[in-house]
């Protein structure tokens, strides 16, 4: 099967509190042969801005991320599993974890919630049947998916995505200093390829995830702005780009571990069109 070919028999599995244990058992088996994990999250937007003086634009971007991730809760996590050839496991390839979220008690940006609601996210069900993040973290830590150098993470403009995962896994606020954030990131996720960061070496590729997918002639499975579908599309985009622009080989020294808009990837945040990182935080990808 060619890399990133769409097969409509691939299924996205919805995970709630009631089936979390069973699905994590399945994932422990899947990760053994399918060690590329494409990831996306849905979260309730941006509600705060950091105040004070900042050493650089990069520092401001991290502090913006930190204050919002500390204040807010993750809503969904999508994980798609693929192998070195970009092939999916038989049956289910994508797991969409739905976390406990309460519109009455939890903070959010109104426009983000409206977007997610229109995308089909069922907030009443999240309130009643959502996964507790601390229990998820316990299972995830022993799943073979994190803390493993053999697992390769694929993402798209993913500072916030990894921010929420680190917050869940450490059960604490994010570090005050960006360098400490990247040290924790490398511990949990030793190998990361951010597709948006890779795009700087891909002539004519531009825009958010949906726009990039259309340029690569990829067909989405499932609804946009849901984490499962977005993670699946991210994985497809990575393998198509690797084939088209990188001759099926990514230079780890140049690309591995860089997140678009943070740290060494921060110089690509602003290209004359305003603050791209805040746009991503509001899920305009």
Curated annotation (Swiss-Prot):
Q: Which residues bind a divalent metal cation 2?
A: 40, 42, 230
Q: Which UniProt keywords apply?
A: Cytoplasm, Exonuclease, Hydrolase, Magnesium, Metal-binding, Nuclease, Nucleus, Repressor, RNA-binding, RNA-mediated gene silencing, Transcription, Transcription regulation, Translation regulation
- Single GO BP term: regulatory ncRNA-mediated gene silencing
Q: How is the cofactor bound?
A: Binds 2 divalent metal cations per subunit with RNAase activity being higher in presence of Mn(2+) than of Mg(2+) or Co(2+).
In terms of InterPro entries, this protein maps to: CNOT7/CNOT8/Pop2 (IPR039637), RNase_CAF1 (IPR006941), RNaseH-like_sf (IPR012337), RNaseH_sf (IPR036397)
Any one Gene Ontology MF annotation carried by this entry is: poly(A)-specific ribonuclease activity
Q: What is its EC number?
A: 3.1.13.4
Q: Matching Gene3D superfamilies, A to Z?
A: Ribonuclease H-like superfamily/Ribonuclease H
Keyword Cell membrane in the entry? The reply is no
Compartment list: Nucleus; Cytoplasm
Catalytic activity from the UniProt record: Exonucleolytic cleavage of poly(A) to 5'-AMP
Q: Keyword Transcription: yes or no? A: yes
Positions binding a divalent metal cation 1 in this chain are 40, 161, 278
Chain's role: Has 3'-5' poly(A) exoribonuclease activity for synthetic poly(A) RNA substrate. Catalytic component of the CCR4-NOT complex which is one of the major cellular mRNA deadenylases and is linked to various cellular processes including bulk mRNA degradation, miRNA-mediated repression, translational repression during translational initiation and general transcription regulation. During miRNA-mediated repression the complex also seems to act as translational repressor during translational initiation. Additional complex functions may be a consequence of its influence on mRNA expression.
Q: How does it assemble?
A: Component of the CCR4-NOT complex.
Family statement: Belongs to the CAF1 family.
Q: Which PANTHER family match?
A: CCR4-NOT TRANSCRIPTION COMPLEX SUBUNIT (PTHR10797)
This one is known as: CCR4-NOT transcription complex subunit 7
Q: Which organism is it from?
A: Xenopus laevis (African clawed frog)
Gene that this sequence comes from:
cnot7
